[in-house]
Amino acid sequence: MTFNEQPTGTTGALSPLIYQAYDANYTQAGFYYQFEIYVWSGTTTLPITPIVTIDRKPDQFGGGRGWIDAHKIAAQYITTDFLVNGTYKPNIGDGAYYVAVKVQGIYDSGSTAQITSNTQLVTGGWNYTIDGLNADYSAKYVYTDKPAVYITANTTEYYLWYDATQITTIGIAAYTTTPNAVSTSDTKIQGIDVMQLITAAGTSGEDYPIVFSYSGGSVSIPIQYQCQNKYGEVDIHFLNKYGVYDSFVFNALSRKTINITREQYNQPIYKQADLNTAWSYGVQITTPYHTNGIEQIVVNTDYLPQAYNEVMKQLQFSQNILMVEGSDVYSVRITDTAYTEKTIVNDKLIQYTFTLEYNQPVINKIVR
């Protein structure tokens, strides 16, 4: 049997996870391909029982091949609440799971040998169509596409994530720290709070790069302190294409609005004790109900280099955004439906504006 499978690296479960099988016995009576899909956390050892078994008849228009796409099954297990704000060195936890597939051909008079695929780690990330089929993140050591980290003296937290099976130390200036111990799927990808690392290194206010070292090389990302604007900054963490919470500081004008919704009911005026009371100006004849509001905030970036366009595009596609307000963290989403990529040639100075909408109403009516 020929089995086209996923590579062994890490990839996103929001894009197709295609597995394709072909066996010359597909012309046998009653032939079908049986795919067993495994999604689990822990060590790389496959569980005894698959999550689901899918039988596929050979595709007569595809030369007798059979295929499945496992991404929707895997995505059901991946969570987006793995980041506990304030953690110095967080693990990805349930934000990543292992996926593997077994396949064999079964027909009336027999069956083929069962083949087991590679084991792949999947996150809540995605791949662009132009990346090709079954793309993965094997070439990435640090899971961000930002060319630099921009912060202010008032930034409280800022996360970068990396492949903890490859990175050996993370450092600023002469100070270094090491990843948490890696043993299972929930620790293979880890993060670092840049602000706490800066404090530990004693380099607050200084533009030292953060360096992620691995065997045979390193990844260096510049850190630049910017003057905070008079409006106050808006800090967010957003799920990027790699399925981890990338951070960004909106260090320009921001403005909040609340869109209020309500219904109303006109009561009969004769419900009062007497007509004089009924005709009083203080009587609430028109009564509002189901009153609530959705809060939005319009945020603006500071001037950015053109190399930041990919980060802004990933923010637009993000499946979840966390906005930090003091000690509170709110889930928000972008309501803009169009993204215009800006360039130095066309726009000279590059700034972006986004409208963020809170994912919970102003008045607590979440429990139905």
Locate each region found by the language model.
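Extracellular/virion structural assembly segments
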Residues: 2-4, 8-13, 24, 159, ...
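Preference for solvent-exposed, low-hydrophobicity sequence contexts
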Residues: 1-229
